[in-house]
């Protein structure tokens, strides 16, 4: 490879790239512009990998119901999720486990390691690679009966998520899908609490084209696979997010996650 040109994906850390090329005459170039269009639309085999990965994710989330309880920590839950994925042959990403007030931070990274308590509400966002293809899903766990406010917020997020799935059809504009799902939350008075895009593509990379976000006007195509994941995050209180993966197929949109979207009350 001396004197050659190597394109690096956006997911490669600069320090790793330097380690790989310092002793060579390789010219490094940004490969994201090359790889992104190639990964945007999946063929049928790739979609089958994503279907199988999502079935495994469903099973992991189902098994998790038997583990979450007062007294365990967020980190305990995260480690158990990774164990469940590994047991099924997956290579897990570190999951989001955000309980109580931590759920009010959309991108909470587990730094608090809070102990689960009675009456907690917990965001669990998990995924893993199976056959090199990534799955992704978010569900909500409630320790005991939710409050009236939690029920209200959950119903709003669920309605927005359902609208997002219904609008995600062949030829639909991602920006329009985001707008219509977001409108549900805005109309309910929580627009300022929905602070991120509606969804992202997934495949070999957990976050890739197409992005379901304002400004993306490229119509959805056969082979696209992406998340629909609206959320409401109430500062200092709690958060709610619900996420499924959708694939655009020759016969129409297909929801890859089969696990029920109703509240999981333990």
Residue ranges and their predicted role:
Residues 1-266:
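Active-site neighborhoods and metal-handling regions in enzymes and metal-associated proteins
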């Amino acid at each position: 490879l001396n004197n050659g040109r190597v394109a690096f994906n956006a997911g490669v850390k600069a320090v790793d790239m330097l380690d790989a090329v310092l002793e060579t005459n390789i010219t490094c170039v940004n490969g994201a512009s090359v790889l992104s269009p190639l990964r945007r639309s999946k063929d049928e085999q790739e979609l089958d990998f994503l279907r199988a990965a999502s079935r495994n994710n469903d099973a992991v989330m189902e098994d998790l119901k038997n583990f979450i309880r007062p007294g365990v920590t967020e980190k305990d839950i995260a480690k158990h999720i990774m164990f469940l994925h590994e047991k099924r042959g997956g290579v897990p990403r570190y999951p989001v486990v955000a309980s109580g007030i931590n759920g009010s931070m959309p991108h909470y990274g587990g730094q608090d390691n809070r102990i689960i308590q009675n009456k907690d509400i917990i965001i669990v966002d998990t995924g893993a690679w199976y056959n090199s293809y990534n799955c992704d899903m978010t569900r909500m766990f409630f320790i005991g009966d939710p409050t009236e406010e939690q029920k209200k917020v959950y119903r709003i997020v669920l309605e927005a998520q359902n609208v997002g799935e219904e609008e995600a059809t062949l030829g639909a504009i991602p920006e329009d899908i985001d707008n219509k799902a977001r409108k549900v939350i805005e109309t309910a008075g929580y627009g300022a609490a929905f602070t991120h895009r509606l969804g992202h593509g997934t495949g070999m990379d957990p976050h890739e084209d197409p992005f379901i976000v304002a400004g993306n006007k490229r119509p959805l195509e056969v082979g696209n696979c992406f998340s629909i994941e609206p959320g409401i995050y109430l500062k200092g209180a709690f958060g709610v997010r619900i996420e499924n993966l959708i694939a655009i197929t020759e016969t129409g949109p297909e929801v890859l996650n089969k696990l029920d979207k109703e509240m999981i009350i333990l």
